[in-house]
């Protein structure tokens, strides 16, 4: 059995969904495989910002800095914050155990 970590998705209405997610998947993949409404229109190819999520600063700081392509797409995201990332670019590792991922109230798909 592959190792899992705890991921909490905070949905727009404040509801929290706690999921045991396998290491190596992206936040976008975990959302899709657990019926969480995180769009991902470009399927993780860094061509949109519909998988925009907001992280707690503690976990944001555990990630590598976003690449320029991700930053360019984040500039298009609705409700951008200092701890915004694209869900397709966050790959689960052990150091992210307990991560809380907040979904923004809306998305903007500019392709």
Swiss-Prot record:
Binds 1 [2Fe-2S] cluster. GO terms for biological process: P450-containing electron transport chain. InterPro entries: 2Fe-2S_ferredoxin-like_sf (IPR036010), 2Fe-2S_ferredoxin-type (IPR001041), Adrenodoxin-like (IPR001055), Adrenodoxin_Fe-S_BS (IPR018298), Beta-grasp_dom_sf (IPR012675). The gene is fdxB. This is 2Fe-2S ferredoxin. Gene3D superfamilies: 3.10.20.30. Ferredoxin are iron-sulfur proteins that transfer electrons in a wide variety of metabolic reactions. It comes from the Bacteria.
């Amino acid at each position: 059995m592959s190792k899992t970590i705890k991921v909490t998705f905070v949905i727009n209405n404040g509801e929290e969904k706690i999921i045991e997610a396998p290491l190596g998947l992206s936040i976008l993949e975990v959302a899709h495989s657990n019926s969480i409404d995180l769009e991902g229109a470009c399927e993780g190819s860094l061509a949109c910002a519909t998988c925009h999520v907001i992280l707690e600063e503690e976990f944001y700081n555990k990630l590598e800095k976003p690449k320029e392509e991700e930053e360019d797409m984040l500039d298009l995201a609705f409700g951008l914050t200092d701890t915004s990332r694209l869900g397709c670019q966050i790959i689960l590792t052990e150091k992210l155990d307990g991560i809380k991922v907040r979904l923004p109230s809306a998305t903007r798909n500019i392709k």
